[in-house]
Structures are given as C-alpha cells and as structure tokens.
Amino acid sequence: MMRLRTCTVAATLALMLAAACTETTGTPEGQMLALSVSGLQPLASGFHYEGWAIIGTTPVSTGKFNVDAQGNIVTLTGAPVAGGIFRTDRDLRGASAIVITIEPAGDVDALPTATHYLAGALGSGAATLTVGASQALGNDFTAATGKFVLATPTTATTTDEKSGLWFLDLSSGSPATGLSLPTLPAGWKYEGWAVINGVPVSTGTFTAVNAADDRKLFSGPLAGPPFPGEDFIVAAPTGLTFPTNLAGGTAVISIEPSPDDSPLPFTLKPLAGAIPATAADHVTYPMTTQTSGFPRGSAVIR
C-alpha cells in the first residue's frame, strides 16, 4: 500500500510539473495582455479595435478585436476571446501605456491610426483605460456645454422655422457660439444630430464650433450662419418628410471616429438636449452633458 501511494503521488507531481512547463513555454511571462472593456460598441464595415503597448516610443500591437452586441471581446471573425487575453511575441513589461485604437477595414500595417480611443498609463503592470487619458482623446468632456435654436435661415419662408436645428446662442439677440467643446485630436470629429420621430439625422460633422460644418445636405438655397447646424427642407431620408417639426425631438452632439465606420451616431455623445414639445423658433434651448456612460477598460500584463 505504501509503495502504491508513493507512486501515485509521484505521478501526480509529474503531471503538475508537465502542465506548468507547458503553460510557461506556451507564452513566456510578460507576453500576454488581459483586456476588460465596458461600453464599447461593435464596429461595422470591417473596422475594428486594436490594442497597443507603448514601449519607449514604439507602439507594439497586442492584437486586433471587436466586440459583440453584448460588449464581449471577440476576434475579427466573431469568436470569443477567452478571458480577454491576447498573446504576443514581445515582453510587454517595459511598456509605459496601453492604447486602444480604431482601425479601418483591411488594415495590415504595424502602426496605429490617429484614432486613439481608450488609453491609460501602466503602473505595476496594470492600466485603467479611459477616453480622457492623454494618449486617447485627452479630455473627459464633463465641462462641455451646448445651446441650440430652431430656425430655417436657408429658406425665405417663415412657415417652416421649426424644421431647422442650429447650434448657436440667440439669447443676446444676435447669433453667438452655442457650443463649448474641447479641440479634438486627429482621428476624430464632432457631429450634430436631430432625432426626428426616433430617427437620428445628421446635421454634419465639424471640428470648429464657430464655423459652418462640412455639409448642407438637407438645407434650402440660402446661405446658413457660420455655426454647425442644418435646415431639414429637401432630400428627406426614407420614412421622413421635410419640412418637418423638430419639437418633441432631441438635439445631440456626438464624437465620431474619422474615418467613420457607420452613418449612425457613435457611442460618444457628450451633449444632448430635449426639444420641448411646445418649442418656439428662435428661442435658445440648453443641452446637458451625457458622459457618465463613456467606455472604460482595464489592461493587465501577465
């Protein structure tokens, strides 16, 4: 009996040592990154996320990924990434920061895009990833403020005044800047939206709050003011009719990746304002900050 017990213990120890050796030799210590994220949206049109460890001044890819409809980390083919663990062929323990970027479809190079989404400095091999990190957007947008009016300056008629949304301030009697937003880093743009009967319709993308945005897809023939906004007069999307009445809808400012993976609003929406059901034209209405649900994450080098 003693001999049998000794043999059994020896065999068990041998199996444990073999398993330990297999785990160690499979991925050496310091070459794995465990990611956990919340609030990310699935990217469309082949766009995807990619992790980077910043070693010195060199970005080292820790792997490409997307998230599913439940926010779980998945491969580019949709398979689950067990434990959010990515294996690399580099020792990551000398990294100073972890950065998550948004990469375009077909990306094969070894460099990150300018669209840095989440990031965080590493300390003791771990990092908290936020939008506000200096390596990401560099601002948490909690100080953002906004105002808007309903008006249709691009038409001569006065019967459609509630069919235009402009991010400006008329409280002084003269048009003034209605948005207070930080300057975005490369790879990002702001975009205005009017939610009409539950449908988000873009007013255009912009980077300056005191200049016209980049398009007037739905506006009338006259010139608009030098501020972001749109009149909804022509070329209504399917299911909508222009001119319309924006009262009872919502005005939104989003932050969009550039280039963008989708024509729909992105997750980052720092400002929103309900348009009263009894809204009057040429009256200034406020927007409120909406940053509590911004994505977050953590990264641990193993």
Predicted segments with their positions:
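Detector for methionine-enriched segments
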Residues: 1-2, 16, 32, 287
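Bacterial N-terminal signal peptides that target proteins for export
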Residues: 1-9
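Bacterial N-terminal signal peptides
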Residues: 10-18
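Hydrophobic alpha-helical segments
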Residues: 8-11, 48
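N-terminal targeting/export leaders
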Residues: 21-302
